[in-house]
Amino acid sequence: MQDSFRMEWLLEISQCVVRDLEKYGICVVDNFMGKERAETIHRSVVSMYETGIFVEGETVGLKSSKTGTAKNVRSDKITWVDGSENNCATIAHLIATVDTIIMNFIRINRLTQSGHQTPIGGRTKAMISCYPGNGSHYVKHVDNPNRDGRCITATYYVNKDWDAKETGGLLRMFPQAWPTKVVDIEPILDRMVFFWSDRRNPHEVQPSFRTRYAITIWYFDAKEREEAKERNNVKTNVAVGSDENKTATLLSHI
């Protein structure tokens, strides 16, 4: 009975993602994993950060260096996981849940012959990011400005008792669908945000004055991704700050 209820819930969320991305380009889902799982993910992320494995995030065309140039653009630290690492079982569950929603998203679009019809053929590993307070930020940017294949950004927040009025750290979006408006999203515990990765959604992380964590997965437009590989003549991992060991996982069951 519980499995049946969960599948119905996932389908309902998937329908919301289809509807909201089509209409607004953004979809926000609260209480995504449930409080208990969300707090377990929070503890796992904090524990990983405390081991010192996170590295400075990089940006296209800029190297993370002592000059501070890259830090002026983004000042987060990141690491990549696939869920098989120690103490990552609940993160693996999160990844599987998002995969299911994206698979449902594809099926719904196929059945309705609407929305994004190009097959989504893979994704990155999950990038865990930490903005370590002290005004750490990421300036206004687009995840995929140059057709590198990234189609949908899925970001999950694990920040307990977050109050943006006191600590900042808002995700501010400038959606093309609402050219006269901005959308401010607080990075609260157990909140998931889906949005188009291309130029339809410029966004920024405003200065954060408390440690701020997020987990992000990018899903690929299969055709655009292959074109990007051919164009670059290399099998690169599009996720900035990564290396070839973090290349996309194919969703062969889609």
Question: What would you call each of these model-derived segments?
Answer:
Residues 1-192, 198-254:
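Fe(II)/2-oxoglutarate oxygenase catalytic core
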